[in-house]
Amino acid sequence: MQCIYFTSVLLVIFAQNGQTDDGGMCMAKETCTETQQEAPTNNLYKAADNKYITLIEEALAAYKPCESSNCSCHLDVLKTDLRPFRSGITQDLIELARSYGTKYQIIGHRMFRQRDCMFPARCSGVEHFIRPNLPKLPDMELIINCRDWPQISRHWNASREPLPVLSFSKTNDYLDIMYPTWGFWEGGPAISLYPTGLGRWDQHRVSVRKAAKVWPWEKKLQQAFFRGSRTSDERDPLVLLSRMRPELVDAQYTKNQAWRSPKDTLHAEPAQEVRLEDHCQYKYLFNFRGVAASFRFKHLFLCKSLVFHVGQEWQEFFYDSLKPWVHYVPVPVGINEWELEHLIQFFREHDQLAQEIANRGYEHIWNHLRMEDVECYWKRLLRRYGKLVKYEVKRDEELVEIF
Protein backbone atom coordinates (compact mmCIF):
# COMPACT_ATOMS: atom_id res chain seq x y z
CA MET A 1 0.00 0.00 0.00
CA GLN A 2 1.22 3.45 -0.83
CA CYS A 3 1.99 5.91 1.88
CA ILE A 4 3.01 9.57 1.81
CA TYR A 5 6.57 10.31 2.86
CA PHE A 6 7.06 13.90 3.93
CA THR A 7 10.85 13.72 3.99
CA SER A 8 11.11 14.40 0.27
CA VAL A 9 8.77 17.38 0.58
CA LEU A 10 10.86 18.79 3.41
CA LEU A 11 14.04 18.38 1.35
CA VAL A 12 12.45 20.40 -1.44
CA ILE A 13 11.47 23.03 1.09
CA PHE A 14 14.94 23.25 2.61
CA ALA A 15 16.50 23.40 -0.84
CA GLN A 16 14.29 26.31 -1.82
CA ASN A 17 15.06 28.16 1.40
CA GLY A 18 18.76 27.60 0.90
CA GLN A 19 18.91 29.50 -2.42
CA THR A 20 19.46 32.84 -0.65
CA ASP A 21 22.28 33.69 1.72
CA ASP A 22 19.91 35.21 4.24
CA GLY A 23 17.77 32.05 4.42
CA GLY A 24 14.68 33.98 3.34
CA MET A 25 15.00 36.62 6.10
CA CYS A 26 14.59 40.29 5.22
CA MET A 27 17.84 42.09 6.16
CA ALA A 28 17.83 45.42 8.00
CA LYS A 29 19.04 47.55 5.05
CA GLU A 30 16.59 46.00 2.57
CA THR A 31 13.19 47.32 1.69
CA CYS A 32 10.88 44.60 2.90
CA THR A 33 7.79 43.97 0.82
CA GLU A 34 4.86 41.66 1.26
CA THR A 35 5.78 39.93 -2.00
CA GLN A 36 9.33 39.20 -0.81
CA GLN A 37 8.04 37.64 2.39
CA GLU A 38 5.25 35.56 0.86
CA ALA A 39 6.88 34.21 -2.30
CA PRO A 40 8.93 31.44 -0.62
CA THR A 41 5.89 30.29 1.36
CA ASN A 42 3.77 30.17 -1.77
CA ASN A 43 6.44 28.10 -3.52
CA LEU A 44 6.56 25.68 -0.62
CA TYR A 45 2.81 25.22 -0.63
CA LYS A 46 2.95 24.62 -4.38
CA ALA A 47 5.63 21.94 -4.01
CA ALA A 48 3.62 20.08 -1.38
CA ASP A 49 0.38 20.54 -3.33
CA ASN A 50 1.92 19.05 -6.45
CA LYS A 51 3.17 16.04 -4.52
CA TYR A 52 -0.25 15.30 -3.02
CA ILE A 53 -2.01 15.74 -6.36
CA THR A 54 0.48 13.41 -8.05
CA LEU A 55 -0.01 10.75 -5.37
CA ILE A 56 -3.78 10.91 -5.81
CA GLU A 57 -3.57 10.74 -9.61
CA GLU A 58 -1.16 7.78 -9.52
CA ALA A 59 -3.31 5.90 -7.02
CA LEU A 60 -6.45 6.41 -9.11
CA ALA A 61 -4.67 5.31 -12.30
CA ALA A 62 -3.63 2.03 -10.64
CA TYR A 63 -6.94 1.40 -8.90
CA LYS A 64 -9.39 -1.23 -10.11
CA PRO A 65 -12.71 -1.02 -8.25
CA CYS A 66 -14.12 -4.22 -6.83
CA GLU A 67 -17.41 -4.89 -8.58
CA SER A 68 -18.31 -7.99 -6.60
CA SER A 69 -21.51 -8.15 -4.57
CA ASN A 70 -20.10 -10.72 -2.13
CA CYS A 71 -17.02 -10.96 0.06
CA SER A 72 -14.68 -11.82 -2.83
CA CYS A 73 -13.24 -8.29 -2.57
CA HIS A 74 -11.41 -9.55 0.51
CA LEU A 75 -10.58 -13.14 -0.45
CA ASP A 76 -7.00 -12.45 -1.55
CA VAL A 77 -6.28 -11.87 2.14
CA LEU A 78 -7.71 -15.29 3.01
CA LYS A 79 -5.64 -16.99 0.32
CA THR A 80 -2.48 -15.33 1.62
CA ASP A 81 -3.23 -16.21 5.24
CA LEU A 82 -3.87 -19.89 4.46
CA ARG A 83 -0.93 -20.32 2.08
CA PRO A 84 1.55 -21.40 4.81
CA PHE A 85 -0.78 -24.34 5.56
CA ARG A 86 -1.34 -25.55 2.01
CA SER A 87 0.31 -28.89 2.83
CA GLY A 88 -2.27 -29.45 5.57
CA ILE A 89 -3.03 -28.85 9.24
CA THR A 90 -2.02 -31.73 11.51
CA GLN A 91 -3.01 -32.65 15.04
CA ASP A 92 0.56 -31.95 16.18
CA LEU A 93 0.29 -28.36 14.92
CA ILE A 94 -2.98 -27.87 16.80
CA GLU A 95 -1.46 -29.19 20.03
CA LEU A 96 1.53 -26.86 19.66
CA ALA A 97 -0.81 -23.92 19.00
CA ARG A 98 -3.19 -24.65 21.87
CA SER A 99 -1.63 -22.19 24.35
CA TYR A 100 -2.02 -19.28 21.92
CA GLY A 101 -5.80 -19.08 22.00
CA THR A 102 -9.10 -20.72 22.87
CA LYS A 103 -9.57 -24.26 21.59
CA TYR A 104 -12.73 -25.15 19.68
CA GLN A 105 -13.86 -28.41 18.14
CA ILE A 106 -16.53 -28.96 15.50
CA ILE A 107 -17.60 -32.60 15.45
CA GLY A 108 -20.75 -33.93 13.81
CA HIS A 109 -21.96 -30.35 13.23
CA ARG A 110 -21.81 -29.68 16.99
CA MET A 111 -19.49 -27.13 18.57
CA PHE A 112 -17.31 -27.52 21.67
CA ARG A 113 -15.07 -25.04 23.48
CA GLN A 114 -12.63 -25.16 26.35
CA ARG A 115 -14.31 -24.15 29.61
CA ASP A 116 -12.26 -21.07 30.38
CA CYS A 117 -12.67 -18.22 27.92
CA MET A 118 -10.51 -15.21 28.81
CA PHE A 119 -12.97 -12.75 27.24
CA PRO A 120 -16.53 -14.17 27.32
CA ALA A 121 -18.06 -11.41 25.15
CA ARG A 122 -15.38 -11.91 22.54
CA CYS A 123 -15.88 -15.67 22.49
CA SER A 124 -19.62 -15.10 22.23
CA GLY A 125 -19.14 -12.78 19.24
CA VAL A 126 -16.93 -15.33 17.50
CA GLU A 127 -19.42 -18.11 18.19
CA HIS A 128 -22.25 -16.01 16.76
CA PHE A 129 -20.58 -16.10 13.35
CA ILE A 130 -19.54 -19.76 13.46
CA ARG A 131 -22.90 -21.18 14.54
CA PRO A 132 -24.86 -20.70 11.25
CA ASN A 133 -22.13 -22.58 9.38
CA LEU A 134 -22.16 -25.72 11.54
CA PRO A 135 -24.57 -27.79 9.38
CA LYS A 136 -22.17 -27.65 6.41
CA LEU A 137 -18.79 -27.84 8.14
CA PRO A 138 -16.54 -30.90 8.31
CA ASP A 139 -15.00 -31.94 11.61
CA MET A 140 -12.15 -29.66 12.63
CA GLU A 141 -10.26 -28.10 15.52
CA LEU A 142 -9.58 -24.36 15.78
CA ILE A 143 -7.34 -22.25 17.99
CA ILE A 144 -8.96 -18.81 18.10
CA ASN A 145 -7.03 -15.97 19.68
CA CYS A 146 -9.37 -13.40 21.27
CA ARG A 147 -6.58 -11.24 22.66
CA ASP A 148 -5.76 -7.90 21.06
CA TRP A 149 -2.31 -9.00 19.95
CA PRO A 150 -1.45 -11.57 17.23
CA GLN A 151 0.54 -14.61 18.33
CA ILE A 152 2.57 -16.29 15.57
CA SER A 153 5.68 -14.32 14.60
CA ARG A 154 7.13 -14.99 11.17
CA HIS A 155 10.57 -14.33 12.67
CA TRP A 156 10.62 -17.48 14.76
CA ASN A 157 13.15 -20.17 13.91
CA ALA A 158 12.87 -20.70 10.15
CA SER A 159 12.87 -24.47 10.61
CA ARG A 160 9.74 -24.26 12.74
CA GLU A 161 6.41 -24.73 11.00
CA PRO A 162 3.90 -21.87 11.40
CA LEU A 163 1.06 -22.65 13.77
CA PRO A 164 -2.61 -22.32 12.71
CA VAL A 165 -3.86 -19.61 15.08
CA LEU A 166 -6.76 -17.33 14.14
CA SER A 167 -6.53 -13.65 15.19
CA PHE A 168 -8.60 -10.60 14.27
CA SER A 169 -5.66 -8.32 13.48
CA LYS A 170 -1.97 -8.51 12.71
CA THR A 171 1.02 -6.84 11.07
CA ASN A 172 3.26 -8.27 8.36
CA ASP A 173 5.48 -9.62 11.14
CA TYR A 174 2.87 -12.26 11.99
CA LEU A 175 1.44 -15.35 10.30
CA ASP A 176 -1.86 -15.52 12.17
CA ILE A 177 -4.95 -16.29 10.07
CA MET A 178 -7.23 -13.26 10.24
CA TYR A 179 -10.94 -13.58 10.99
CA PRO A 180 -13.61 -10.84 11.13
CA THR A 181 -13.55 -9.60 14.69
CA TRP A 182 -16.17 -10.44 17.31
CA GLY A 183 -16.80 -6.69 17.42
CA PHE A 184 -18.92 -6.84 14.28
CA TRP A 185 -21.54 -8.42 16.54
CA GLU A 186 -20.68 -7.69 20.18
CA GLY A 187 -17.86 -6.55 22.42
CA GLY A 188 -15.18 -4.20 21.21
CA PRO A 189 -13.84 -1.16 23.08
CA ALA A 190 -16.04 -0.35 26.07
CA ILE A 191 -16.48 3.33 26.93
CA SER A 192 -19.19 5.19 28.82
CA LEU A 193 -21.19 5.73 25.61
CA TYR A 194 -20.89 2.03 24.70
CA PRO A 195 -20.46 0.25 28.04
CA THR A 196 -20.65 -3.24 26.52
CA GLY A 197 -18.53 -2.31 23.50
CA LEU A 198 -19.32 -0.90 20.08
CA GLY A 199 -20.70 -4.14 18.66
CA ARG A 200 -23.61 -4.45 16.19
CA TRP A 201 -22.00 -3.21 13.01
CA ASP A 202 -25.33 -3.70 11.24
CA GLN A 203 -27.00 -1.17 13.55
CA HIS A 204 -24.16 1.36 13.45
CA ARG A 205 -24.23 1.29 9.65
CA VAL A 206 -27.81 2.53 9.76
CA SER A 207 -27.42 5.12 12.54
CA VAL A 208 -24.17 6.67 11.29
CA ARG A 209 -25.43 6.81 7.72
CA LYS A 210 -28.53 8.61 8.98
CA ALA A 211 -26.30 11.15 10.76
CA ALA A 212 -24.29 11.64 7.57
CA LYS A 213 -27.46 12.76 5.81
CA VAL A 214 -27.98 15.42 8.49
CA TRP A 215 -24.44 16.65 7.83
CA PRO A 216 -23.90 16.70 4.05
CA TRP A 217 -20.48 17.81 2.82
CA GLU A 218 -21.35 21.48 2.37
CA LYS A 219 -22.62 21.72 5.98
CA LYS A 220 -19.74 19.93 7.67
CA LEU A 221 -17.28 21.90 9.79
CA GLN A 222 -13.92 22.44 8.08
CA GLN A 223 -12.05 20.96 11.01
CA ALA A 224 -10.09 17.79 11.61
CA PHE A 225 -11.55 15.80 14.49
CA PHE A 226 -10.38 13.10 16.90
CA ARG A 227 -11.51 11.79 20.28
CA GLY A 228 -9.86 8.87 21.99
CA SER A 229 -7.62 7.81 24.83
CA ARG A 230 -3.85 8.16 24.77
CA THR A 231 -2.98 4.55 24.00
CA SER A 232 0.23 5.71 22.30
CA ASP A 233 2.14 8.94 21.72
CA GLU A 234 1.49 8.61 17.97
CA ARG A 235 -1.63 10.68 18.63
CA ASP A 236 0.18 13.52 20.39
CA PRO A 237 1.05 15.70 17.34
CA LEU A 238 -2.60 16.06 16.32
CA VAL A 239 -3.65 16.91 19.89
CA LEU A 240 -0.84 19.46 20.18
CA LEU A 241 -1.79 20.99 16.83
CA SER A 242 -5.36 21.27 18.09
CA ARG A 243 -4.13 23.33 21.02
CA MET A 244 -2.20 25.63 18.68
CA ARG A 245 -4.80 25.81 15.90
CA PRO A 246 -8.23 25.07 17.43
CA GLU A 247 -10.00 26.50 14.39
CA LEU A 248 -8.24 23.87 12.24
CA VAL A 249 -8.30 20.81 14.52
CA ASP A 250 -10.47 19.59 17.39
CA ALA A 251 -8.48 16.69 18.87
CA GLN A 252 -8.59 15.83 22.56
CA TYR A 253 -7.81 12.88 24.78
CA THR A 254 -10.45 11.05 26.78
CA LYS A 255 -10.05 8.83 29.83
CA ASN A 256 -9.41 5.13 29.67
CA GLN A 257 -9.14 2.51 32.41
CA ALA A 258 -5.50 3.43 33.05
CA TRP A 259 -6.14 7.18 33.51
CA ARG A 260 -4.82 8.53 36.82
CA SER A 261 -4.13 12.25 36.27
CA PRO A 262 -4.01 14.94 33.56
CA LYS A 263 -0.51 13.68 32.78
CA ASP A 264 -2.20 10.70 31.13
CA THR A 265 -4.08 13.04 28.78
CA LEU A 266 -1.02 15.08 27.79
CA HIS A 267 -1.30 17.53 30.71
CA ALA A 268 -4.92 18.48 30.10
CA GLU A 269 -8.21 17.50 31.65
CA PRO A 270 -9.83 14.59 29.79
CA ALA A 271 -12.47 15.45 27.23
CA GLN A 272 -15.92 13.93 27.03
CA GLU A 273 -16.40 10.99 24.70
CA VAL A 274 -18.28 11.63 21.45
CA ARG A 275 -20.83 9.37 19.78
CA LEU A 276 -19.95 7.95 16.38
CA GLU A 277 -22.91 9.79 14.86
CA ASP A 278 -21.59 13.13 16.11
CA HIS A 279 -18.32 12.64 14.23
CA CYS A 280 -20.25 13.28 11.03
CA GLN A 281 -20.40 17.03 11.52
CA TYR A 282 -16.65 17.27 10.73
CA LYS A 283 -15.11 17.09 7.26
CA TYR A 284 -11.85 15.45 8.33
CA LEU A 285 -11.74 12.45 10.67
CA PHE A 286 -8.52 10.95 12.02
CA ASN A 287 -8.03 7.27 12.75
CA PHE A 288 -5.17 5.90 14.87
CA ARG A 289 -4.37 2.34 15.82
CA GLY A 290 -4.99 1.33 19.42
CA VAL A 291 -3.22 -1.63 20.95
CA ALA A 292 -3.83 -3.29 17.58
CA ALA A 293 -6.05 -2.32 14.64
CA SER A 294 -8.67 0.32 15.40
CA PHE A 295 -12.33 -0.70 15.78
CA ARG A 296 -13.21 2.92 14.95
CA PHE A 297 -11.81 2.85 11.41
CA LYS A 298 -14.70 1.32 9.47
CA HIS A 299 -17.30 3.51 11.19
CA LEU A 300 -15.63 6.78 10.16
CA PHE A 301 -16.22 6.17 6.45
CA LEU A 302 -19.98 6.04 7.01
CA CYS A 303 -19.98 9.77 7.83
CA LYS A 304 -18.97 10.58 4.23
CA SER A 305 -16.13 12.58 5.76
CA LEU A 306 -12.51 12.41 4.61
CA VAL A 307 -10.69 9.78 6.66
CA PHE A 308 -7.03 10.32 7.60
CA HIS A 309 -5.55 6.94 8.52
CA VAL A 310 -2.33 7.13 10.56
CA GLY A 311 0.03 4.20 10.04
CA GLN A 312 -0.29 1.32 7.59
CA GLU A 313 1.14 -1.45 9.76
CA TRP A 314 -1.93 -2.96 11.44
CA GLN A 315 -4.45 -4.85 9.34
CA GLU A 316 -7.87 -6.45 9.56
CA PHE A 317 -9.30 -8.75 6.91
CA PHE A 318 -10.91 -5.90 4.93
CA TYR A 319 -8.13 -3.30 5.08
CA ASP A 320 -6.35 -4.47 1.94
CA SER A 321 -9.38 -3.65 -0.21
CA LEU A 322 -9.15 -0.01 0.90
CA LYS A 323 -6.56 1.92 -1.10
CA PRO A 324 -4.60 4.97 0.12
CA TRP A 325 -5.37 8.22 -1.74
CA VAL A 326 -8.38 6.48 -3.32
CA HIS A 327 -10.52 5.80 -0.22
CA TYR A 328 -8.61 7.62 2.51
CA VAL A 329 -5.57 9.81 3.18
CA PRO A 330 -2.57 7.82 4.46
CA VAL A 331 -0.56 9.55 7.18
CA PRO A 332 2.85 8.24 8.30
CA VAL A 333 3.57 7.46 11.92
CA GLY A 334 5.96 10.09 13.27
CA ILE A 335 4.43 13.02 11.42
CA ASN A 336 4.87 16.31 13.29
CA GLU A 337 2.49 19.19 13.92
CA TRP A 338 3.82 21.32 11.05
CA GLU A 339 3.38 18.51 8.54
CA LEU A 340 -0.11 17.73 9.81
CA GLU A 341 -1.10 21.36 9.54
CA HIS A 342 -0.02 21.53 5.90
CA LEU A 343 -1.70 18.24 5.02
CA ILE A 344 -5.04 19.31 6.47
CA GLN A 345 -4.70 22.75 4.89
CA PHE A 346 -4.12 21.16 1.49
CA PHE A 347 -7.49 19.42 1.61
CA ARG A 348 -9.21 22.54 2.90
CA GLU A 349 -7.91 24.30 -0.21
CA HIS A 350 -8.76 21.36 -2.51
CA ASP A 351 -12.29 20.70 -1.36
CA GLN A 352 -13.43 18.77 -4.43
CA LEU A 353 -10.52 16.32 -4.16
CA ALA A 354 -11.34 15.81 -0.48
CA GLN A 355 -15.01 15.14 -1.18
CA GLU A 356 -14.23 12.70 -3.99
CA ILE A 357 -11.96 10.60 -1.73
CA ALA A 358 -14.54 10.75 1.06
CA ASN A 359 -17.30 9.55 -1.26
CA ARG A 360 -15.22 6.68 -2.63
CA GLY A 361 -14.37 5.57 0.90
CA TYR A 362 -18.01 5.64 1.92
CA GLU A 363 -19.20 3.75 -1.15
CA HIS A 364 -16.59 1.03 -0.70
CA ILE A 365 -17.40 0.39 2.95
CA TRP A 366 -21.15 0.64 2.41
CA ASN A 367 -21.15 -1.78 -0.53
CA HIS A 368 -18.38 -4.21 0.45
CA LEU A 369 -18.39 -4.35 4.25
CA ARG A 370 -22.00 -5.23 4.88
CA MET A 371 -22.88 -7.71 7.59
CA GLU A 372 -23.46 -10.29 4.85
CA ASP A 373 -19.87 -9.72 3.68
CA VAL A 374 -18.63 -10.39 7.20
CA GLU A 375 -20.72 -13.57 7.40
CA CYS A 376 -19.56 -14.59 3.93
CA TYR A 377 -15.90 -14.22 4.92
CA TRP A 378 -16.43 -16.35 8.02
CA LYS A 379 -18.09 -19.03 5.87
CA ARG A 380 -15.26 -19.05 3.32
CA LEU A 381 -12.64 -19.07 6.07
CA LEU A 382 -14.18 -22.02 7.92
CA ARG A 383 -14.77 -24.10 4.80
CA ARG A 384 -11.30 -23.54 3.37
CA TYR A 385 -9.68 -24.12 6.74
CA GLY A 386 -11.70 -27.32 7.17
CA LYS A 387 -10.37 -28.71 3.89
CA LEU A 388 -6.82 -28.33 5.22
CA VAL A 389 -7.41 -30.50 8.32
CA LYS A 390 -5.60 -33.78 7.65
CA TYR A 391 -6.55 -35.94 10.63
CA GLU A 392 -9.59 -37.48 12.28
CA VAL A 393 -10.82 -35.15 15.00
CA LYS A 394 -11.64 -36.97 18.23
CA ARG A 395 -13.72 -35.50 21.03
CA ASP A 396 -11.69 -33.68 23.68
CA GLU A 397 -13.53 -34.39 26.94
CA GLU A 398 -12.08 -31.23 28.53
CA LEU A 399 -14.20 -29.12 26.19
CA VAL A 400 -17.85 -28.24 26.80
CA GLU A 401 -20.61 -28.25 24.21
CA ILE A 402 -21.66 -24.78 23.07
CA PHE A 403 -24.11 -25.60 20.27
From Swiss-Prot:
InterPro entries in alphabetical order: CAP10, O-Glucosyltr/Glycosyltrsf_90
Binding site residues for UDP-alpha-D-glucose: 227-231, 235, 274-276, 292-296
Localization in the cell: Endoplasmic reticulum lumen; Secreted
Glycan-linked positions: 70, 157
This protein's UniProt keywords: Disulfide bond, Endoplasmic reticulum, Glycoprotein, Glycosyltransferase, Secreted, Signal, Transferase
Residues spanning the signal sequence: 1-20
SMART domains, sorted: CAP10
Cysteine pairs bridged by disulfides in the record: 66-73, 71-376, 117-123, 280-303
Residues the record marks as active site: 148 (proton donor/acceptor)
Biological source species: Culex quinquefasciatus (Southern house mosquito)
GO cellular component, one term: endoplasmic reticulum lumen
Similarity remark: Belongs to the glycosyltransferase 90 family.
Name the record gives this protein: O-glucosyltransferase rumi homolog
